[in-house]
Every structure is written in C-alpha cells, then in structure tokens.
C-alpha cells in the first residue's frame, strides 16, 4: 500500500504540481512536399546513431554507394579524391571517440565535410551521408553531417535535432545512463519501490528518469552551486551550435560571407557568454571569474561523472599542477603566444602571418579575434599547416588533464574535448576569461565613443518601466532513447521513443519593458536593451569606466519614431537572440505530416535558450540594472545571411559597450538606466528537487 501511495504522489506531482510559465503558441512555418521529404531523410540518419538499421532506406543506399563511380556528381573533384585517398588509408574506426580537438581526427572530419559540401545536389548529398553513416565512425559522421546541413544551400532551413537527443550520454551523468540501461536490460521495472526511490517512474508508454545535476563529487569546490546553469542541456547545445555555425577550421571566404567580421563575432560570443555566466556567479555569491597561471596549480578541479559507451572522462583534482614535465613544451608555447600579442600591443602594430595590423584601429577587432581563435582566416591558404598551432586547443589539452593519447585514434577524453561538455568544466570559463582579458587590453587602445557619436538629435528616452522579474525552477523532459541499444526486432518495428530524462531547469515569467520616447523628428531608430550588475561582488556600485565589459546585450530592434510621444512595449518573448526549447523528433514528425516545421528550430536554432534569459534571482530580489539605448538606424549594405539578425547595421557588435567608456559621454537623453531586481520563487536550489525527496517539494509559483 505504501508503494502505491508514494508512486501515486510522485506521478501526481510531476503531472500537476510542477509550475510552468504561461503556455506559448508554437511558431511554425509552412513547407512544401519537397522540403518534407528532405527533412525526413535528414532526420533518419540521426536516429539510433550508434547502430545500423539494415531495414532502413539509408542502409540500403549507403552500403553499396560508390563514391568514385559518381565523382562527376561533385563540384570539387579534388576534394573527393582527397577524401578517397584518406579513406583507403584508414579512417577513425567505428565506436572510437571523436573530438575535433585532435588533429588527425579533425583532418578526416574536414575531408568528410568536403565530400558532403561539394555534392552537386541533395540526392548526391544524401547518398554520400548514407555511405558515411554505414561505413564511418558515428561521431565523425555526425560532426561533418551537422555542419554540412547548415552550410549547404539546398538544406537551408532544415530542422536539426537537439544534440542532447542524439548524444544523451554527453548531457546527463552516468548514474542516469546506468538507470536507463538497467531498465532496458530488465525489460522494465522489477521493483517499483526501489524505482521510485531512485527517481524512475513509468508514465503512459514511457519511462521517466530523474537526473541530478552534479554535486560536490564532481565539483569539490564552490562551483557546484552553478551546476544548474553550466550543465543546462540548452546552454550546452547552444555552444555546440555556435561551433558548427563557425568552425575554427572553416574559411569564411570559401564557405560564407563573414570574413570581415568573423573575429569580431568570435569575441562577441565569448564576451556575452562569460557575462551571462558572471551574472549567475553574482547571484550565487561567487563574484568574479577566478584567474589562473600557467606556472601555478589550477585551484578548480573537476570530476565529470560522464562516460561515453567506451571511455570514461578524465578527472582533474583541485590544485592541479599544470606546470608538469609533460606540459613544459605546451606551456612554453602558450606563454609565448600570449607574450607575442602583448608585445604587439605595446608597439601598437602586429606583424605576422603576412599581415601588418595597426592595433589602435577598431577594424583590428576582427584580426584580434582570428588571432585568439587561431582560425583558418588568420592564415592564407598558401601557409603550410606546419606553421599553425592553436592556442585554444593546446590550452584545452593542458587544462583537461587527460593522459597522453595512446595512439592517433585512442584517447581518454576530458570535458574540454567536446563542445557538448566544455561548459561543465569551470576552467573553461577561466580560460576564455583570460582570452577576453587580452581583448580588453587591446580595446584600451581604442578611442571611446564621443558624445557626438552617441547623441541622437531630437530624441529623448523619458522613462523605462520594467515588470517584476521572477525566476523559478521547473521540470523539463527530453527524449533520451538514443542512450540505449535496441534489438533488431525493435529497430525493425520502429521501437517507440520511450525513455525520457527529467531535470529541474531554470526559467522565468515573461515580462514587458515599456519605453517612453519623446521625439522632435520622424526617424528610423535602433533600440537596444542591456542588462548589467548594479553592485559588484563586494557590494560596491559598479562604474562604467571599470565595468563596461559586464553588460549583457538582451535585445535589439528597429523602430519608426514619429514626432511627439512614442510608447514602445517590448515583451521578453520578442527578444531577438533567444529561442524556445527544441521539440523532440517525435513531435517534428507530427508537424511534418501537416506540412510545417518549428520556426525557431529552422531559423534560430543557434540562439540562447529563452529560459536562461535572466539569472536566478533571490527571495528578496537581486539588484541589476537595464540600459536602454536609442540611436539612428543606418542599414548595412552587405549581405550577411544568416547573420543579419546579429548585424542589423555597421556598428560594432555590443555597441556602445564594445570598448572602454567615458562616463560623461553616456549622460545622454537617448540613454536611460533603470534599476531592477530579480526575484526567485519556489525552491531556491535545484537539488531541492532531488531524489527521493523530489516528490514532496513545495513549489507554489502561480501561473500568470
């Protein structure tokens, strides 16, 4: 009887008591039958990626597809020949780990990407992908496949499944993975009482597994407070999608149209990510991101409770000695790379890589980004690979603390070896904070924006009113069926996606920002909304001179201003750089039957999760400030597809907080500062939803 009551209480909780934000209307777009057919073919190659379904169409096509016999169906025969040469010498074996940060594995993945990218038409692309799905390593295939779908014109708008649905083992800890394997091996629940105690319930036709965030076992330090943020599946998917949009080995001139601002985009992405992380540190009482030295022990350890199907992740203890004998040469390189940049700053000019760059010019921003990413646009194609060595990759290897690879195809991964897991490691933020610090040193040489440049003649922001800002935790389910292996019979009968992971994730109530503008003229304007701290970690008010780099750009849009009073009501659901949670593939198929796809997943899949817009608040309200900046709109004349939402004009990304600030110039009628507080309702810590007590929590956040 007790078992029944406990189970009933748990199911009742997860079905009715958990609070969700007000339901939103799913924004979709109509697609034609050709698109639907292509979309289904693309999705089929993502399913059960660690297994081969010999009954599926892709297997029958890929098993016997002859690339060499079809070489005329590719626009770059040299790329196909290079792939075949490498393939005949041997590619990464199936079921080995793949990481783009290992040179040999990356070279093979790039060759595979070229095979996909240079296919003349979708049919050839699909056959090439089916060949790779059958014959090549699954991790290597997925990496090249994701990028090719984004870069090819005939797959533009195709919906990509969330990476946590494809690689669940990289997004949840091993204890959850073990529960799923155990249930599968037992063909269901054997002991209901034990199942409930360990956070496993059966709801309708699927099993639900409660998944904890990491605790003091993983973070034997204060970083465990941030696990709900750094391990959020949406945030980690966001970082993965950033990379596949702009891989560091990718040449902008060859594949895209972003060469002039590529390095700037790199800086802006990491600057904004670190600022958002800093906000979370503030509200958790941690303050600034710690610094480290290549010549002293790294204070922050990390014991990731992650594993692939084949290899556990390496661990780094607290006070890890990076300056060890095996790292001497790598640290000499890292130190020299940093010093070379600092010396160039002192001279005001950078000479190298066949370029002369004057560092007191704002146009150098993109070069500086290319330098620190060490991407393909830093070097000309005539420069041999022998002269290229990536600062980022070497730094990840040193901080990851993994043993030396056994051979070219065998290595023990660290969290820093994958874009899907990097954000879990606290040293990730410390490393990129170090890189952004060098950017900020460069920006000290730039002239601050003048009062004349910031001023908007005839336009004044009279007032800004912000609704109450409220955060809370809510349960979120995602499909994790790809974790387990299916029998041939289950594959043949399209075994239902019936394994789900449930986690408490941060969210917020939608809010409005009301902006009152008085204008003497009719004009087109850009309206930007920033969020920044009100006080630093020591409780002192921040200053624009010292803290200009700590403002997070939440939204920007254009608006036609008319003479007289103008009232703009901007809802948080309209903020441009945020997206809704991805739909599971099962829901995508249902929409495809109606000739529709989710707009967010088709157009904006690389955006930040909307639920992480605000940092977790406090019971009494944590102080922040919003800044509204209105300035004249001047459209860009360049084609920047698909980045036009980020670059609506020719102003620097993050403008006007893109460089050091002269406070007197910010006292403008078109710039308005508004103090706000972020409140948190319901359970304050994610672990308060923990097993086994998570069925008795008291979250009473009302729906609006």
Swiss-Prot record:
UniProt keywords, alphabetically: Disulfide bond, Glycoprotein, Secreted, Signal, Storage protein
Biological role: Arylphorin is a larval storage protein (LSP) which may serve as a storage protein used primarily as a source of aromatic amino acids for protein synthesis during metamorphosis. It is a constituent of the sclerotizing system of the cuticle, and serves as a carrier for ecdysteroid hormone.
Residues carrying covalently attached carbohydrate according to the record: 73, 212, 360
Highest rank taxon of the organism: Eukaryota
Keyword match Secreted: yes
Region forming the signal peptide: 1-16
A molecular-function term among this protein's GO annotations: nutrient reservoir activity
Organism: Antheraea pernyi
PTM statement from Swiss-Prot or TrEMBL: Glycosylation at Asn-360 is required for proper folding.
Pfam families per record: Hemocyanin_C, Hemocyanin_M, Hemocyanin_N
Assembly notes: Homohexamer of two stacked trimers; disulfide-linked.
Protein name: Arylphorin
Compartmental location: Secreted, Extracellular space
GO cellular component, one term: extracellular region
Family: Belongs to the hemocyanin family.
